[in-house]
Regions:
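Paired small-residue
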Residues: 107-114, 122-130, 334-339
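A late C-terminal transmembrane helix in Major Facilitator Superfamily
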Residues: 355-393, 403
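Conserved MFS/SLC helix-loop-helix module at the cytosolic interface between two early adjacent transmembrane helices
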Residues: 83-122
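Juxtamembrane intracellular "pre-TM" segments in multi-pass secondary transporters
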Residues: 19-27, 211-242
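Cytoplasmic helix-loop-helix junction between adjacent transmembrane helices
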Residues: 127-166
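Helix-breaking motifs and short loop linkers at transmembrane-helix boundaries and internal kinks
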Residues: 62-64, 96, 117-123, 134, ...
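Helix-loop-helix hairpin linking two adjacent transmembrane segments in secondary transporters
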Residues: 119, 123, 160-208
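Structural signature of the two symmetry-related core transmembrane helices
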Residues: 99-114, 194, 304-320
Length: 475
């Protein structure tokens, strides 16, 4: 029995299968419930952010605060999620995945209750910071669990599957938020979010087994964690994919932070109309993410797909800036909504592939690698967030400028640091679930790529055994 009561079985059977070709259908290897649970964990950040979005104008009025100050409630939550991942990721490498995850979810629930009770915008900002710090455990450990269970192309497929689940959150969250505002005020949004946090925590407690065996945990303290992160950042490709994903996320978060004001204040849409548009954009992201996982991965180089995604984001951001500047005259909401839909949909082939390509560079420090991935994304997003409000609420130019600048920097990092034209390990032909072709870099002093057949077989035996263990816990 693992910690918390979730049962584990069939480990030896899975380990014995190390020489077989892994089944790339994620739910068959991991179990439907655990797959859904991991997706729910990755959905905690969009739930915490997006459910609250329709209430931003009301918070501005209710707490008598300027829009820029209210937007800090988004920025601080995002910054908390960034910094929290740096702490929780290495903790999960040392103490396993379950205990830090359960502790983080508990604090998240308490912080959400305090947000609902906040009497001033200053306290709301502080409580949102605490909420973000605690919520970081969900996303960073979910990614680390995936890395525990999968390698190579199978990992890329699984991330796309998680996007199908976690992508429901941006669709449903603003709709829930908009409906809550019909019957109560903005505080009710945090009450509902508290209930969701309790439900996810209960599922983790009862259904998610430990995926990092004690023998593979790091025994060192802060020093070892820092050395591990330094080793990861010394790998230019890992750093390049991490920064590429971070700046792509900044373009996404510029939309998240500014769109409530652009759509509701500039174009006069209701909170319910905004929620529907936001949900439609999230549908585009989910659908494209599934095309990525079920059609493109294994057939087209991940680097090539990522490059196409970045080009689409850049094109959509350019169109938004031209419309915001009035180059085409007075533009109605529809063309702006189309451009935002295209930008959001392109994230479905951008974000999961940057995560998979970066995590292919490491195996023995998945928590630290996941922490660096998440921290860069959330920290860069937190910096971008207040920039969209510097010119006030009556123009969309700052949002478009931030999106375009972020897309340009993301593309520069991808081309300049990742050097996709030299990639030989992320092509369609290497979809056997083994971390193929990543012989260039070392992660925390351990060679990330293994070209020796025996070593690869051992690595696959471990991940197969873990997947069998999780499947046993889900049955």
């Amino acid at each position: 029995m693992p910690e918390g009561g979730a049962s584990i079985s069939n480990t030896e059977q899975g380990a014995a299968a190390g020489t077989e070709r892994p089944d790339l259908t994620p739910h068959r290897r991991t179990g439907l419930l655990v797959t859904f649970l991991l997706g729910s964990l990755t959905a905690v950040p969009p739930l915490a952010m997006d459910m609250y979005l329709p209430a931003l104008p009301e918070v501005t009025r209710a707490l008598h605060a300027p829009a820029a100050t209210v937007q800090l409630t988004l920025t601080t939550c995002l910054a908390g999620m960034a910094l929290g991942q740096l702490v929780v990721g290495p903790m999960s490498d040392r103490w396993g995945r379950r205990r830090p995850l359960l502790a983080g979810l508990g604090v998240f629930v308490v912080a959400t209750v305090l947000c609902a009770l906040a009497p001033t915008v200053e306290l709301l900002v502080a409580f949102r910071l605490a909420q973000g710090l605690a919520g970081a455990a969900a996303i960073v450990i979910a990614r680390a669990v995936v890395r525990d269970l999968y390698d190579g192309m199978a990992m890329a497929r699984f991330f796309s599957t998680l996007m199908l689940i976690s992508g429901v959150a941006p669709i449903v969250a603003p709709l829930i938020g908009g409906q809550v505002l019909r019957v109560t005020d903005w505080r009710g949004v945090f009450v509902v979010l508290t209930g969701i946090g309790i439900l996810i925590g209960a599922l983790v407690w009862t259904r998610l087994p430990e995926t990092l065996p004690p023998a593979e945990r790091h025994s060192g303290g802060v020093g070892e964690a820092l050395r591990s992160m330094r080793g990861l950042l010394a790998d230019r490709s890992f750093a390049g994919y991490t920064l590429t994903g971070g700046f792509a996320f900044a373009a996404l978060f510029a939309y998240i932070s500014a769109s409530p004001f652009v759509i509701q204040e500039i174009y006069g849409a209701s909170p319910q109309t905004f929620s529907l548009l936001f949900g439609l954009n999230s549908v585009g992201l989910v659908v494209v993410g599934q095309i990525n996982g079920k059609v493109l991965v294994g057939r087209v180089s991940l680097d090539r797909v990522l490059g196409i995604g970045l080009a689409i984001v850049l094109t959509a951001a350019t169109a938004l800036l031209l419309m915001s500047l009035g180059v085409f005259g007075e533009v109605p909401l529809a063309p702006v909504a189309v451009a935002l839909f295209v930008l959001m949909s392109a994230m479905g082939i951008t974000l999961p592939n940057t995560q998979a390509l970066a995590l292919m560079r490491t195996k023995h420090a998945a928590g630290s690698a996941s922490a660096l991935l998440g921290t860069s994304s959330f920290l860069i997003g937190a910096i971008a967030s207040p920039l969209v409000g510097v010119a006030g609420e009556d123009t969309a130019v700052p949002m478009a400028v931030v999106q375009l600048a972020a897309a340009l920097v993301a593309l520069a990092c991808f081309v300049g640091m990742c050097r996709p034209w030299k990639s030989d390990g992320h092509t369609a032909g290497k979809s056997d679930g083994i971390t193929a072709g990543t012989t260039a870099g070392k992660s925390d002093g351990i060679t990330a790529g293994t070209t020796d057949g025996n070593t690869a077989g051992k690595s696959d035996g471990k991940t197969d055994g873990r997947r069998a263990s999780v499947e046993g816990a889900d049955s």
